[in-house]
Amino acid sequence: MQNNEIQPSFLIQKVYTKDVSFETINSPACFKEQWNPSSDFNIDINTTKINNENFELDLTITVTTKNNETNVYIAEVTQSGIFTITGMSEEQIDSVLNTYCANTLFPYAKRIIDSSIIKGGFLPLNLAPINFDAIYLQKKSSPKREH
């Protein structure tokens, strides 16, 4: 190994909540109905290069819950982090951001979603762990759409 080679390194600089929203739809009528919920989950990951070594990742989770086909609530959080990554190729950095960094932020986002739903007067959801590696591989293997 040459002396001028940079060793791969990864550092979490900051974890923070960028945005939170919770909307109860059709209240108070929704609290009087028999509870038979179904929920849709949407996950979005956006990365921003701050400079050569620092990157911001935004993990947005949206939960839309219906009861008997009527929308009841929408909960959304954007959990963000700033990460320092050095000594890696662009492809490696992309992989680390979309997998490891997303996994790092998920527990924070999950806690906020759960808290919002409970404070909104609803039963908690059990958000299962997310396989960000599989999501990343699927995204990489999907053909890119042209607009």
Curated annotation (Swiss-Prot):
It is found in: Cytoplasm. Its main location: cytoplasm. It comes from the Bacteria. GO terms for cellular component: cytoplasm. GO terms for molecular function: unfolded protein binding. Keywords: Chaperone, Cytoplasm, Protein transport, Translocation, Transport. GO terms for biological process: protein folding; protein tetramerization; protein transport. Disulfide bonds: none annotated. PANTHER family: PROTEIN-EXPORT PROTEIN SECB (PTHR36918:SF1), PTHR36918. Belongs to the SecB family. HAMAP family: SecB (MF_00821). One of the proteins required for the normal export of preproteins out of the cell cytoplasm. It is a molecular chaperone that binds to a subset of precursor proteins, maintaining them in a translocation-competent state. It also specifically binds to its receptor SecA. Homotetramer, a dimer of dimers. One homotetramer interacts with 1 SecA dimer. This is Protein-export protein SecB 2.
